[in-house]
Regions:
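Extended hydrophobic leader/signal-anchor segments used for secretion and membrane insertion
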Residues: 1-249
Length: 249
């Protein structure tokens, strides 16, 4: 039997759940946040890659050859515009690839795929420098055409006949215990570590094809600042006053 009351009374819609609208709103906010975050991180990564490729790069110092200017494991920021855009100068602290035989055989520790991925990601932001052990850090003593001799009667290096007082060396460190007389080829540099007694630099590679010189093609750039640890933070001076009176070759 049909219930007349049911026919005459209007159907009532089920009440809406007020919480569902709020849930959808929160979900949309979360999705929007995730998308924005991915865009920001992606943009930062691309920008960092561009900066790393064309402007600056981070390295760590693997040895004590530049003590006490640079400490072992210091992290340095390198200006990659030097020397291709900005000319290299005497006194610059430079990072360069092994010109051939300077480092010998460099052993590397195998990494798991996860470790390699994390290292790649961090290096893209300049937070790590996984290839630092394949590079060297030294100070430029001579540029193309310079005639460098060790040593003068008072034990100093001479460049183009002018003796220099190397104020970046720690007290008591001799300019060199090894005598040499070289002329730097055009397009190359002559480099030495500030820790002269513990630096396998240009002086010790004259028997190699490079003759101890570093060609421009191997130079990564000029180290401009110690960025880590914060206690060591400082701009790296090229001590222009040391070389200001050196005549042109």
């Amino acid at each position: 039997m049909v219930n007349l009351g049911q026919l005459l009374s209007p159907k009532r819609k089920a009440p809406r759940n007020p919480g569902s609208k709020w849930s959808r709103f929160r979900k949309n906010i979360f999705v929007s946040f995730v998308i924005d975050l991915l865009v920001i991180v992606g943009s930062a990564l691309v920008l960092s890659l561009l900066i790393k490729t064309f402007l600056v790069r981070s390295f760590f110092v693997p040895s004590g050859s530049m003590l006490s200017t640079l400490q072992i494991d210091d992290r340095i920021i390198v200006n990659e515009l030097v020397p291709n855009v900005v000319p290299i100068e005497r006194g610059d602290v430079v990072v360069f690839k092994d010109p051939g035989g300077w480092l010998g055989t460099v052993s590397t520790t195998p990494q798991s795929p996860i470790q390699a991925s994390v290292d790649w990601f961090l290096s893209a932001f300049g937070l790590t420098a996984p290839d630092s052990s394949q590079h060297l850090v030294k100070r430029v003593i001579g540029v193309g055409g310079d005639h460098i001799v060790c040593c003068s009667a008072d034990g100093k290096l001479t460049i183009n006949g002018k003796a220099i007082t190397e104020t970046y060396l720690d007290k008591g460190i001799k300019p060199s215990d090894v005598k040499f007389d070289v002329t730097v080829p055009q397009g190359s540099i002559w480099v030495m570590g500030d820790n002269r007694g513990n630096s396998e630099d240009s002086r010790f590679h004259g028997d190699l094809p490079s003759k101890g010189f570093v060609a421009k093609q191997f130079i990564v750039g000029r180290a401009v600042v110690i960025s880590w640890p914060t206690a060591h933070w400082t701009w790296l001076d090229n001590f222009a006053n040391v070389f200001k009176d050196v005549p042109k070759p």
